[in-house]
Amino acid sequence: MPFSSHPSPDPSPDPSPDPAPDDTRVALSVLATIDPVLRDSAVFGLVVGAPRVVALRHDIRAAEGALRRVVVDASGVVEDEVVPLEHACLSCAVREDAVPTLRRLADDGRWDHVVLALPVAAESLPVVRALAAQTTPGAELDRLRLATVLAVADVDTLEHDLLDDELVTERGVGLTEDDQRAVGEVLAAQLEHADLVVTTGDPVAAATGAGLVDRLRGVGTRRVDGLHALAAADLAGHTHDPVAGERRAHPLGVRGPLPRRARRAGDRSWTVELRSARPFDPERLLRRIEDLGTGRVRSRGVFHVANRPDSLCAWDGAGGQLCIGTLGTWDDATTAEGRPVEPHTRVVVVGATPPEGEPGDGVRERVLDAFRDVLATPDELADGGLRWLGRTDVLAPWLGARTDAV
């Protein structure tokens, strides 16, 4: 294994191959975090003492319509410029500056590993998706190969960061002036997509934070405790699998509960997997959606609704917010092995019980009760869905009109 990791409850091997010995392309690693101090500390640790490593750091200045580009290596700051953008957004930053700058750094010849440090609170998936397309043969970045996608998180604050309802704008790390994403939404997306999660803080004293990391990171990924354990050579010795990364981040690929033996002393984290072949009743779902999807939980998965049986619907909740929508049809969905996926409801809920001495919050019990209540009963389904014909579609504001839904 390229990573020396903390003992992990995940027994599965790292599915991504090491680069071929004769692969001379420049390694490209992508770093995401919600904390500017963690980002800068990680970048410093990666370039110090590694003269062949260079880091490209971006910060979006939405109010100015610009981004700040900083390039550093072991010798210090190589570049520090403010670059105007057509639109001050993440996709424009990648298209207008990251891609040409990465190509220039790869062509320079001084470095064989580039670390792209994303703007604080940026999600790695859309950036890596764009970079994967650009690193194919004949594309603009074909001199680079995707190495490691990593997320850096602090286990001491992770329970608060993930489960509370603070917004990124309230914390001062929003990508735009009106960024209404929850901190927990961003953090969860970073952890769920990463090949490697690097933690700071004490994983023993903050066992719940460490437990939440393990419940969210994908099967086959790694966790390393401490920035001191992070080495650029380890990152370069890995090859990111874009397909596996997309699958981890997809609502169909949500990680299920950990083995019971994996719990460490002091770990109050928990996972509840809500699964049924039956669809949700739309009216009851709307009535109890807050009980099922809001509060101090991270919930993610797929569901189907009795009055639109062909629609594959996504469920994504964190930081007190919940988003539902359609992903297409069940006929288009396949497993990682390419097999068809039958319509089903599967939502994985992750949370933490209150510390000892504090009153219980009853979240797990509330979620389980709401799930049982909103499922359509066998008697309701016996007529093939006729009972829902002609009724007002109460979920249309979120899922679209049934005539337009796929």
Regions found by a protein language model. Give the residues of each.
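A structural signal for short secondary-structure junctions
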Residues: 22-24, 294-295, 307-308, 339-344
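A short, charged/proline- and glycine-enriched loop
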Residues: 22-28, 267-268
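Short cationic amphipathic helices and targeting signals
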Residues: 116, 197-198, 270-275, 345-352
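Generic C-terminus detector
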Residues: 334-406
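Intrinsically disordered, low-complexity terminal tails and inter-domain linkers enriched
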Residues: 4-24, 357-359
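Short, conserved charged micro-motifs
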Residues: 39-41, 205-209, 280-284, 355-369
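C-terminal accessory "lid"/substrate-recognition subdomains
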Residues: 2-4, 9, 51, 61-65, ...
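Nucleotide-state-sensitive switch-loop elements of NTP-binding domains
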Residues: 3-4, 26-148, 157-160, 168-174
